[in-house]
Amino acid sequence: MSTFSLKIIRVGITVLVVVLAVIAIFNVWAFYTESPWTRDAKFTADVVAIAPDVSGLLTEVPVKDNQLVQKGQILFVIDQPRYQQALAEAEADVAYYQTLAAEKQRESSRRHRLGIQALSQEEIDQASNVLQTVQHQLAKAIAVRDLARLDLERTTVRAPAEGWVTNLNVHAGEFINRGATAVALVKKDTFYILAYLEETKLEGVKPGYRAEITPLGSNRILHGTVDSISAGVTNSSSSADSKGLATIDNNLEWVRLAQRVPVKIHLDSEDQQYLYPAGTTATVVITGPNDRDPHQASPMTKLMHRLREFG
């Protein structure tokens, strides 16, 4: 084979390799830009901070950390005898003022029947004033009794919804103050995704669009629907000085970092069964109005789907 032919073959191979490289780079670029996506997404759920409405010693904590509880199930009980005694005293006051009010009512009615022929107007008015005072005291006693009854009811703290007890940090015998968070309850069937997408990718994101969610380290692909896009994020480049004037950070004009915007994605109901703890990471791809058919993807596309998980 002549030297000229070898040169032709070498040039042809080089051109072929370059063309294949360009095609591969174009396909990878198209894959990464055809759908808005991010690796910065978090599983999130509705979390209820459980705190008692009364103070006292904890006498019962019948649940364990990370336990699934039903709505209305007892989480913990605060020492009740003190609140039972307060209710008993309040009920005794109500009974006393009810008896006294009935007596003053009879006396006032009797004086009104006798009239000014037998009694002075001052005595009649005095009986009416005493009755009003006793009725006012009775109303206050009833309010105190109702509050004491409410306090007694709230010594038993129940789960407001079905969910998982998380970060249980109290035990029987401890004293707990009113309003102090004792445990967090992660509500069941409330899991959703917060995907932090760059502002340059928001053009392809709309409420109602479908999304693919791949938990970090998992081969399972979950599906969801875009619920909403955050209406605002913090402007980290601007702040106020001690006099209230705007302070703008210096910025290099040729370096413009895209701001990330939270996008809320609701998981499909059939995917709520897969338990990925709130706060864990996932990769999210917005596929548009419809889901993608995984059976139509080429092996190369499937490989790039997997590589996207790692960047």
UniProtKB/Swiss-Prot annotation:
Gene Ontology cellular-component terms listed: plasma membrane
Q: Which Gene3D superfamilies match?
A: 2.40.30.170, 2.40.50.100
Q: Which domain of life is it from?
A: Bacteria
Q: Entry's Pfam families?
A: CusB_dom_1, HlyD_D23
List the InterPro entries: CusB-like_dom_1 (IPR043602), CusB_D23 (IPR032317), MFP_Efflux_Pump (IPR050393), PHBA_efflux_pump_AaeA (IPR022871), RND_pump_MFP (IPR006143)
Membrane-spanning ranges: 11-31
BP GO terms, sorted: transmembrane transport
Subcellular location(s) of the protein? Cell inner membrane
Task: List the membrane topology term(s).
Answer: Single-pass membrane protein
The record's keywords, sorted A to Z, are:
Cell inner membrane, Cell membrane, Membrane, Transmembrane, Transmembrane helix, Transport
| Any GO molecular function | transmembrane transporter activity
User: What role does it play?
Assistant: Forms an efflux pump with AaeB.
The UniProt similarity line reads: Belongs to the membrane fusion protein (MFP) (TC 8.A.1) family.
Protein name according to UniProt: p-hydroxybenzoic acid efflux pump subunit AaeA
Q: What is the organism of origin for this protein?
A: Yersinia pestis
Identify the gene encoding this protein.
Answer: aaeA
